[in-house]
Structures are given as structure tokens and as C-alpha cells.
């Protein structure tokens, strides 16, 4: 089983890449996908391409998790959106070990865990499956399409998918531009300070989980990102993704881009407000892709 397939098969499990389970059989043939949908990875990835009317020839393309695609389409960008069919791999998810005696649940939403030892494990499992398994397969496919310029593929996302965009850019050097909105690349800081995780209480992760987390954490491997023109935009008053974590991420990444001799390829922008910064994000996202993906070098 190759590494990408193993990650996809086990989804939420943070030990997925190391598990010895055999690969699943391809699902039985079902009805054809709806018009416009492209099925990849035995049906696990369902992709849609939104193509602008012009210009002719290969175009810049953005794998986008953003709700508003119209600005990119109007700028002549192919927009790729997708979903993952988790139900196809749920049966291969290994059971979670029982919590230790006396453990107390922590966290909220996808970051919830039966004890502080594994806070955020499911959240980062979802991110890693998207960033390091699904998106590289989508890039493989995009490179075969005549309307796509394979040298100008980017990724953009906000919140959970802002984390995904950041980690995907670190994992795949073919992504030449990225926009990460209201996210952080310092995973330990995020788990420590976010009101969705430990909310400032001490972080005490299981050692195996901690090692896995550090391997995928962008701030611990900032050199993996310097091939990508990266924009980060964060809210100043965001309890979900605290400013301190965004600023730590920016400080580490800015240093990496400077050491690589390309400081202009990284930008960190603060917006007023909290976790919802749509208007600022729209402006900054389009301007960044105009500079680095649509008209690079101009």
C-alpha cells in the first residue's frame, strides 16, 4: 500500500501511514457520477472543475475551499472543488483505545477528545488526509487536463481548510501559490491556546501522537514551504485560532523565506475582527493570486 492510499484509507487515524492493513477492494460499481463530477481514488475523491469562458489555452488553477469562487473565475482561473466520501473508508478506521482511568474529555467539535492526551487528533487526521493524500492526487489529475497550466496550480482555504492549504503546500512542491485564512501552522500552540482545544490549559500529548503531529507541523519544517508563494490572513481577535499562534507561524515562516532568498513570497496580513474576515480575505486572496499565479513575474 503506498503512503497516500494508506492515509486515505484510515482517514482520522493518526497512525494511518504506518498501519499494516491490506488495501481495501475497490467499491462495487454504482451509478455514474452526476454530470460534471470526476471520480478519483476508487470513488473516495469527487472532484468538480469550474472553468471560466476565457482566455483560451491552459489556465492557472486553484484548488479552493472558499465559498466564493466568482472572483477567481472572473479573473480567468480554473477552480477545482472536491469532497471526500468518508463512508467508503470508515470500515477501515481502527478503533480508538479506551481513555485512561480518570481521564476527562476535552475540546470541542473535531478537536474533542476523551482526554488531553489526544486533543485534536481527529482534526489533524482530517487535515492530513486532505493535504497529503487527496490534494496530491488531485494535482496529478489536474496535470493531465488541457485547460490547466500545470506550472500554475495553487490552493486556498479558510479555517479548517486554511490549515489544509498550508499543510498541502508544504507537502507538494507543485503547488506554486497558496492562501491560508484564519489558520495556524504552529499546531502545538493552536492546541494549547484555542478555545476549541485546551483553551490555555497545559498541553500534555501522548508521545506517539506528539511525534506524528510534529512531523506534519509546518513551523517545525518551514523549509518545505519556501517553493510556494504563501499568503496568511488572520483575525486580530480570534479565540479559535489565537493571534499568538498565527504570529508564531508568521515569524518562523518569514525567517525561512528570508533564508531561502525569497522574502517577497511570504506575506502575513492581519484583519480586524475574529474568525470571520470575508471581505478582507476576498481582497487579499485575489490580489495574491493575481501576483503569483495569474500574472507571475509581471
Labelled PLM ranges:
Residues 56-67:
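Short beta-strand element of the alpha/beta-hydrolase
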Residues 8-17:
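Bacterial N-terminal signal peptides
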Residues 136-199:
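Primarily recognizes the serine-hydrolase "nucleophile elbow" in alpha/beta-hydrolase
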Residues 21-56:
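N-terminal cap/lid segment of alpha/beta-hydrolase-fold proteins
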Residues 189-254, 258:
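The feature captures the conserved acid-bearing segment of alpha/beta-hydrolase catalytic domains
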Residues 250-251, 256-298:
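C-terminal catalytic histidine-bearing segment of alpha/beta-hydrolase fold enzymes
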